[in-house]
């Protein structure tokens, strides 16, 4: 299992991917649209592990949640 912290802004989705011991696996960003999320999930598939993510509740978080869950991620929306 890998763990992703997601930070959504109007222009991009930043992510920090951690392993089970808390070590950084990958850090990056993606456009916050359907094509960007598709590219992000395809990019992170190469790690070969399920991903559990958290994203702050804000405009666009539900869209991110739904798209990433369709790609097989487990996503939680956190209230700030």
Regions found by a protein language model. Name each.
Residues 1-80:
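Phosphate- and other anionic-substrate recognition elements at nucleic-acid/protein interfaces
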